[in-house]
């Protein structure tokens, strides 16, 4: 079973600073498993849902609201509340809960605890039956072989993309989690690139729309390129936040007494800093991202003879959706924790426009028009031949086409703040045993430092780690050949995430050293396959209808038939092959989906019988105890 909850509103909190609040969620009977939910202090809600596994029956939750969780001087406890929920919870879907002090946790204590505040929590109780991987293996094989289906337009991922009204975001996230660390991500993504190119009507808008390939590549950029993005942009963004210089160049917006020329110079100085940070960063980009961009260029080059289209495809992801989007909204990409004020926000908007303009000019063959005439002078400066040449070289280098002699940097898979525990030190206060550390997990090492800007205080090769464990106090113990490390995580869920991430990279590194590539499934891979199965089973009737239409050989209605069946974007010589392969894909998918659903049904039946037997045994025990009395 899975508990899902999020905060939809909160109020009455006495905040010292405009910081992110943290709601810790645990069960009364298992306080070691703690979930963490971030609450935006400005919007007074959590943007994400917290999902936690839980047992059946009545569930007693303990919700604790904190600010600054790492036990520092600024840590603030705002209160806690107990919530009881079960499968038939009638108090929802949202309800106000009033926070209590620790003394009033069980309803005891005085009434003079002060006004702590309150929060609204929306709780959804959901039961998911996740089966063993061997049940999902046939579906996983179909997904992994999607890049080998000929023609590529008839693969399972092409079918998923064509299903009506499908949210591609969650699907792409599950596919990336399943494939990103295997050797199947590249052929599968390449097949989706082909689909997007064939469906595109105008090469100038290539990969600008919503597609499964675009969603998957963006998911990889934001997941595996997160640290690369932050280290590249943060120095510039922090400087803009700190200095707050006026960069307004629109005459209609310039304040009275302000110098338009000075503002223009300020904007150009910031842009030059941003430009240099971006165009010299290709050596820091994770190699996986470079490989996928290299595949993107190859596929585009195969299907288009126009020069510059390959760079256009790369820039649409790396510049438009990644760097320019992050500059525009640094908080959403976790470059900053605070929202920019109006002046800083305007500066970031103008810089994002300039970066996009330069990128478009470096990949375009002709002149570009502009609706904002007042920006033309700045556009001419930032789109000089030198700027365009450097940008083009960056797009080549980051897609492995330019200088391949670049040194390969490591890929950061996880990073965050933990407390390093050193019990060997003699300290008169327990708190002195704890030191705040910024910890990074790469594909080869575990690195820790005082903060993100400081030099590393220590590093351990993953190959030297012999054992990793997490205790009930959220202490992560890492045993190496020459030392033992301990880090304390803010909660049980985060500690488990670190444990799984370290073990995953250790296993991956061991396979690479032994040269035994295989299926490196991470913990909870079954849940992601089950999400895809649930989607396919939801559209089972749609897939059966498509299969029957194709097998009947009846002429399709041009107005109502789905594009996947009409295949107007497929060349005439391959349409029959597309049809035959699509029928085979649909038949296999329906059979596999039915088999998984049958396993779910049998599991539910066995579970019901087991619960009935337990109920009968419990009832008989009660009768015996009553008769003795």
Curated annotation (Swiss-Prot):
<dbReference type="Pfam" id="PF00616">
    <property type="entry name" value="RasGAP"/>
</dbReference>
<dbReference type="InterPro" id="IPR008936">
    <property type="entry name" value="Rho_GTPase_activation_prot"/>
</dbReference>
<dbReference type="InterPro" id="IPR001936">
    <property type="entry name" value="RasGAP_dom"/>
</dbReference>
<dbReference type="InterPro" id="IPR011993">
    <property type="entry name" value="PH-like_dom_sf"/>
</dbReference>
<dbReference type="GO" id="GO:0005096">
    <property type="term" value="F:GTPase activator activity"/>
</dbReference>
<dbReference type="InterPro" id="IPR039360">
    <property type="entry name" value="Ras_GTPase"/>
</dbReference>
<dbReference type="InterPro" id="IPR001849">
    <property type="entry name" value="PH_domain"/>
</dbReference>
<keyword id="KW-0343">GTPase activation</keyword>
<feature type="site" description="Arginine finger; crucial for GTP hydrolysis by stabilizing the transition state">
    <location>
        <position position="208"/>
    </location>
</feature>
<dbReference type="GO" id="GO:0007614">
    <property type="term" value="P:short-term memory"/>
</dbReference>
<dbReference type="Pfam" id="PF00169">
    <property type="entry name" value="PH"/>
</dbReference>
<feature type="domain" description="PH">
    <location>
        <begin position="411"/>
        <end position="507"/>
    </location>
</feature>
<feature type="domain" description="Ras-GAP">
    <location>
        <begin position="183"/>
        <end position="398"/>
    </location>
</feature>
<protein>
    <recommendedName>
        <fullName>Ras GTPase-activating protein gap-1</fullName>
    </recommendedName>
</protein>
<keyword id="KW-0963">Cytoplasm</keyword>
<dbReference type="GO" id="GO:0007616">
    <property type="term" value="P:long-term memory"/>
</dbReference>
<dbReference type="GO" id="GO:0046580">
    <property type="term" value="P:negative regulation of Ras protein signal transduction"/>
</dbReference>
<dbReference type="GO" id="GO:0007635">
    <property type="term" value="P:chemosensory behavior"/>
</dbReference>
<dbReference type="InterPro" id="IPR023152">
    <property type="entry name" value="RasGAP_CS"/>
</dbReference>
<dbReference type="GO" id="GO:0008306">
    <property type="term" value="P:associative learning"/>
</dbReference>
<comment type="function">
    <text>GTPase-activating protein, which inhibits the vulval induction by acting as a negative regulator for the member of the Ras family let-60. Probably decreases the signaling activity of Ras by stimulating its intrinsic GTPase activity, thereby lowering the levels of GTP-bound, active Ras.</text>
</comment>
<dbReference type="GO" id="GO:0005737">
    <property type="term" value="C:cytoplasm"/>
</dbReference>
